[in-house]
Amino acid sequence: MKRWSALAGLAVGLVLLVGCREVRVKTLAAGTTTVPGGNQILIVRDAVALGKLGIHAPVHFKGEFGVALLMGPHDRTGYKQIVESIRANPERVRVVAFEQAPADGGEPSPPYRSYTLWIVPNSVYRRGIRVEVVTPSNEPIAATYLP
């Protein structure tokens, strides 16, 4: 009986360890794009979709996918995104982020949006997971689901 409970304990421990694996998410690019729109979080699965966003980055779509956070539009130069945290659990990914206005007020410019592009391994892609972006004060910015 003791042997059975020891094996059961070991099995539970292994399941917990496998479930707690660390995922390496890389911030590949940050910048601006002139593609019109508002605040969005987008899942990018191919080079064509990435190009339509006006983002040019060397993503290897065979083994990874992109997550792009676009914020704006702005009509003054100098806005940039600050990402405070990214937390994930089996139901959702929560990004806490905001935009920092230029200290000098910026210069007038044609409308643009700031973006941050993350690269995520395909091995963690789970259809239906909610991806949400909120401000540090918990106000919603954008949300989507992994298609």
Walk through the language-model features, giving the residues of each.
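Bacterial N-terminal signal peptides that target proteins for export
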Residues: 1-8
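Exposed, flexible binding/inhibitory loops of compact, secreted disulfide-stabilized domains
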Residues: 18-147
